[in-house]
C-alpha cells in the first residue's frame, strides 16, 4: 500500500487551483467537476460536495495539519507571495529554527496551513 494523494477542501476550486499554480507551479491533471487532481499528489475538493459526503461542518484554520514545501531561494518565494497575494494571512513570517532551517507559514485562501522551508 502507498499514500496516493492529499486532499484539501476549498470554497472556490478554480481560485485555489490558480493559487497553487501561481505559488508552487502545481498543474491540473484531471478535473472531475468539483474535484481537481493536481500534480504532486494534491487534490482540491469543493467544500459543498465534501460537506455533503461527510455530513459534517468544515473547520477552517484547524491547524491540525499542514502542506509542507521546500524552496531553495525562500527570499524570492516570499517576494512572489507578497506580490501575488498581498493579503495572505501569516501564521509566522520568515523565521530561522535552531537547526538553521528558514521557514514561513501561512494559510491558503481557505485556511489550509502551508509551510515553506529551505531544504534540510
Each predicted region: which residue ranges?
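Amphipathic alpha-helical segments
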Residues: 14-26
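Conserved short beta-strand elements that form part of the metal-binding/catalytic scaffold
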Residues: 27-61, 113-118
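Vicinal oxygen chelate
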Residues: 3-11, 36, 56-120
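Short beta-strand-to-loop elements that line the ligand-binding cleft
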Residues: 8, 29, 93-96
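Short loop segments at secondary-structure junctions
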Residues: 11-13, 41-42, 47-48, 71-74, ...
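Short secondary-structure junctions
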Residues: 25-30, 87-91
Amino acid at each position: 500500500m502507498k499514500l496516493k494523494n492529499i486532499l484539501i477542501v476549498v470554497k472556490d476550486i478554480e481560485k485555489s487551483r490558480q493559487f497553487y499554480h501561481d505559488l508552487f507551479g502545481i498543474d491540473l491533471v484531471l478535473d472531475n467537476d468539483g474535484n481537481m487532481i493536481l500534480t504532486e499528489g494534491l487534490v482540491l475538493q469543493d467544500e459543498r460536495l465534501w460537506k455533503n459526503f461527510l455530513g459534517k461542518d468544515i473547520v477552517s484554520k484547524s491547524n491540525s495539519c499542514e502542506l509542507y514545501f521546500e524552496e531553495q531561494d525562500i527570499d524570492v518565494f516570499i517576494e512572489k507571495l507578497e506580490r501575488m497575494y498581498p493579503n495572505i494571512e501569516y501564521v509566522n513570517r520568515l523565521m530561522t529554527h535552531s537547526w538553521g532551517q528558514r521557514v514561513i507559514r501561512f494559510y491558503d485562501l481557505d485556511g489550509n496551513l502551508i509551510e515553506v522551508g529551505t531544504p534540510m
